[in-house]
């Protein structure tokens, strides 16, 4: 397929994902929640950048990030030296986390803990859990018991974490698995499982993001107790005031270099890590390297445009919409509106496209992209509804997370293994930049307008979005298992009926059969 045709295909996919969000926001602006022309213009230009960014990023991930991850994973497994695998896995997890742009944002929300201490601790957490995830794959250890143990530790620690810090701690799991790291980590799993020939290899292709998401939560919780952090910080987004088209252009032009630098810093360690593998182990042909290089350029340009559009155009719009809806005569409308937004907005998360495509390929179409998309959308819709209930009532996040994870972990022992791994991966994937830069500001704006505690009541949206897909995707798996059993039983009944008919014929002589 030519590059122009591929770009057109990715553009159509981006349109399908983003147009519903634009339509919903415009309907809200013109019918229910009027906003200033400055915010609306920023939103519309941000939407154009988001569309272009998504198109380029999805193509770049396909050409570069996924092949790089798969080849590194295959290479790691073939080394056959456990200390080397452990050391390189930890280093890889550490490097790709420390360069994640959203980690700096998280660090700024925790003023009691020095930024560098928090960043290094979270990076170590991801590195350690990436090692655990790879060891699980290499030694074919079941995922549900591991998740039960580690989440058990998380919720025991939650009892000792300051209340004002709890939501931020749980948000950290989704924040640090961003669009830069997720495609690479997921492809790493595919590369490792490809070297195995047993029947559970496909099941173990997933689960890396699931375990890596736990590391930051534990790291942030432990730090909050060590430093006795009793508060976290919230800086409201600046609502832009645009006088003319030139000011609109300058607003985006000022922010563009910031994201160019951030994404360059994020991509560079991954490229260097891959080049070390290329020099000493992979030795790919010039043609393959050229294809990866082109893919990296697309990835870079796509993420720069995407993050500029989301953070400059979408964040102020989300915050202001939340304020207007909360101040309206019917603030309860926040719940259904947030659910509708959540249903569609997850489709615009860059890493969700990568996850859905990979799931369809690994399962040979048994779990389709459409089914995955539906499961994620329903999960995020429920999570946004619950998040707005928290904003309106001030209920502690633990009243939602403990039952939610208890259900998710309980179901995991009864569904096909691959569904559990995909479900827990999808939690980290769904809670990406669209959630952090549009849905979270919307909750913060609503909470601010209602006079609530933003730190305890509005933070936690990312954690809620990361939780509900664990249940919805596994319910899909449970339904598929029930259907398979029912089909098998019907097949056996039909076979028994058929064999009974043959037996009846055998009792008759030839003349009797002719008469029949």
Question: Where do the protein language model's features map onto the residues?
Answer:
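Structural signature of hydrophobic alpha-helical transmembrane segments
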Residues: 17, 43-55, 112-124, 171-185, ...
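Hydrophobic alpha-helical transmembrane segments in multi-pass integral membrane proteins
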Residues: 160-168, 219-228, 306-313, 385-386, ...
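Alpha-helical transmembrane segments
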Residues: 130, 134-140, 165, 190-204, ...
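Helix-loop-helix junctions within the multi-pass membrane cores of secondary transporters/permeases
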Residues: 82-153, 331-412
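Signature of multi-pass transmembrane helix bundles
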Residues: 1-59, 74-75, 173, 186, ...
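Flexible loop linkers connecting adjacent transmembrane helices
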Residues: 62-80, 105-111, 314-329, 351-367, ...
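Small-residue-rich segments of transmembrane alpha-helices in multi-pass membrane proteins
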Residues: 21-25, 53, 81-89, 149-160, ...
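Transmembrane helix-loop boundary segments of multi-pass membrane transporters
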Residues: 41-42, 60, 107-119, 136-152, ...
């Amino acid at each position: 397929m030519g590059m122009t045709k591929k770009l057109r295909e990715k553009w159509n996919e981006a349109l399908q994902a983003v147009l519903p969000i634009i339509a919903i926001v415009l309907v809200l602006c013109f019918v229910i929640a009027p906003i200033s022309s400055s915010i609306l213009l920023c939103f519309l230009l941000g939407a154009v950048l988001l569309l272009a960014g998504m198109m380029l990023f999805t193509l770049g991930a396909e050409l570069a990030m996924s092949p790089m991850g798969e080849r590194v994973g295959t290479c790691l497994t073939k080394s056959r030296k456990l200390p080397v695998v452990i050391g390189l896995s930890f280093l890889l997890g550490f490097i790709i986390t420390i360069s994640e742009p959203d980690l700096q944002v998280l660090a700024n929300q925790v003023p009691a803990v020095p930024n560098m201490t928090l960043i290094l601790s979270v990076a170590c957490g991801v590195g350690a859990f990436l090692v655990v995830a790879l060891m699980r794959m290499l030694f074919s250890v079941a995922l549900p018991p591991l998740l039960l143990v580690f989440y058990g530790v998380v919720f025991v620690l939650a009892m000792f974490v300051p209340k004002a810090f709890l939501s931020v701690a749980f948000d950290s799991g989704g924040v640090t698995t961003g669009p830069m790291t997720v495609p690479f980590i997921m492809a790493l799993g595919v590369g490792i499982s490809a070297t195995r020939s047993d029947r559970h290899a496909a099941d173990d292709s997933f689960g890396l993001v699931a375990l890596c998401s736990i590391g930051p939560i534990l790291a942030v919780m432990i730090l909050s107790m060590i430093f006795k952090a009793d508060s976290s910080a919230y800086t409201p987004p600046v609502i832009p005031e645009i006088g003319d088209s030139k000011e609109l252009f300058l607003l985006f032009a000022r922010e563009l270099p910031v994201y160019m630098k951030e994404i360059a810093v994020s991509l560079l360690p991954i490229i260097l890590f891959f080049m070390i593998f290329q020099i000493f182990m992979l030795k790919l042909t010039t043609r393959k390297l050229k294809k990866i290089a082109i893919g990296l350029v697309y990835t870079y340009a796509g993420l720069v445009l995407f993050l500029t559009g989301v953070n400059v155009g979408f964040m102020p719009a989300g915050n202001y919409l939340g304020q207007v809806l909360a101040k309206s005569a019917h603030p309860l409308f926040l719940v259904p509106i947030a659910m509708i937004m959540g249903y569609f907005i997850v489709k615009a998360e860059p890493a969700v496209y990568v996850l859905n495509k990979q799931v369809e390929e690994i399962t040979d179409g048994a779990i389709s992209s459409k089914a995955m998309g539906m499961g994620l959308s329903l999960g995020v819709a429920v999570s946004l509804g619950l998040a707005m209930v928290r904003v309106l009532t001030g209920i502690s996040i633990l009243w939602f997370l403990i039952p939610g994870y208890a259900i998710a972990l309980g179901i995991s022992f009864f569904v096909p293994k691959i569904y559990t791994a995909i479900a827990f991966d999808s939690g980290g994937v769904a809670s990406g930049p669209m959630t952090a830069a549009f849905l979270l500001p919307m909750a913060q704006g609503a909470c601010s307008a209602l006079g609530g505690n933003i730190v305890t009541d509005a933070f936690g949206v990312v954690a809620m979005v990361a939780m509900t897909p664990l249940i919805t995707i596994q319910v899909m798996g449970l339904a598929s298992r029930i259907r398979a059993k029912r089909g098998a039983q019907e097949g056996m009944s039909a076979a028994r009926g058929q064999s009974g008919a043959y037996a009846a014929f055998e009792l008759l002589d030839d003349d009797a059969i002719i008469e029949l």
